[in-house]
């Protein structure tokens, strides 16, 4: 299992988790859920105490990256990631995503 800490506008909001099987999850941390100013990172993943699983998680994080396969392959080559899938690429470049989201190992 591997995980990335997810930040939004500098606030630690949760973890993006990938299991050895390839299954992915996202879970909000307790401090963020209980903050009066907390908002979800996506309307498709509301603030809950349960883990978000499946396509909704994969699609959200995958959409932080370029769609173009060649661009993903260049990122993979430059950073030496195992694959050009979202979790692997975001492990290397997630600190500099578009928008308010950052991912850190």
Predicted regions: what they are:
Residues 1-105:
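Phosphate/dinucleotide-binding and metal-coordinating scaffold of catalytic cores
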């Amino acid at each position: 299992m591997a995980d990335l800490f997810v930040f939004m506008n500098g606030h630690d909001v949760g973890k993006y988790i990938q299991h050895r099987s390839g299954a992915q999850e996202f879970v909000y941390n307790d401090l963020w859920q209980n903050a009066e100013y907390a908002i979800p990172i996506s309307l498709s993943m509301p603030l809950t105490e349960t883990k978000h699983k499946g396509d909704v998680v994969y699609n959200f994080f995958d959409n932080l990256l370029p769609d173009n396969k060649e661009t993903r392959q260049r990122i993979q080559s430059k950073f030496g990631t195992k694959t050009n899938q979202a979790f692997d690429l975001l492990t290397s470049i997630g600190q500099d995503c578009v928008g308010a989201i950052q991912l850190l190992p």
